[in-house]
Amino acid sequence: MAADLSGSPQALKVNNFSAKVGGAPLSASGTLRLTPSMRADLAIRGDGLDLEALTEGFPDLKGQIKGKANLVFDLSGTDKGNTGTGSLSAPSVEAFGLRLANVKLPLSLDGNAFKSSNGTLELYGGKASNSLTFDLKTFKFSDSLTASGVDVNALAQDATGGLGGKVTGQGSLS
């Protein structure tokens, strides 16, 4: 971890902050204002972040998400709460046994609610969109997924760990 800071006790400028997170570089820059009340405005960037390492500490997600992702997130925080927007993208991800491709998730933070609405991805030959909410206070999450044009057999095989038979056709799910 390395940090380059400048400024005064009232306002610190983060010229550059860098650390390894999940084996990949994560960087941040911005401003921390300490008086009259705490406020942070940070631009956070990460390339090639290991999703399995990053989700290891969350019981509901541990070992369930694998792949490398890129993160862009702009955070604004005050003593009244945090807000932010950004995106997470990945060429391929395995989530809960399912193989996803071309993942593009818009991100937002409002207090303890971390959300991804209208994310898109490719799923077994079809297209899918999602709406995810993660509560930072309780570490619980919910996700809804809508998909169309999906190869049902490939999805069923991966979702179940392998069926004894074969499912034919294409499907839509929500």
Predicted features along the sequence, with ranges:
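Low-complexity, polar/charged sequence tracts that form flexible coils or short amphipathic helices
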Residues: 87, 98-99
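Outer-membrane beta-barrel translocator domains and adjoining extracellular loop/strand segments
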Residues: 58, 100-102
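Extended lipid/amphipathic-ligand handling interfaces
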Residues: 1-10, 16-19, 25-38, 42-44, ...
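Short flexible loop/turn segments that cap and initiate beta-strands
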Residues: 82-86
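Extracellular loop and loop/strand-boundary signature of outer-membrane beta-barrel proteins
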Residues: 56-61, 92, 154-160
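Gram-negative outer-membrane beta-barrel proteins
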Residues: 25, 50-54, 94-96, 140, ...
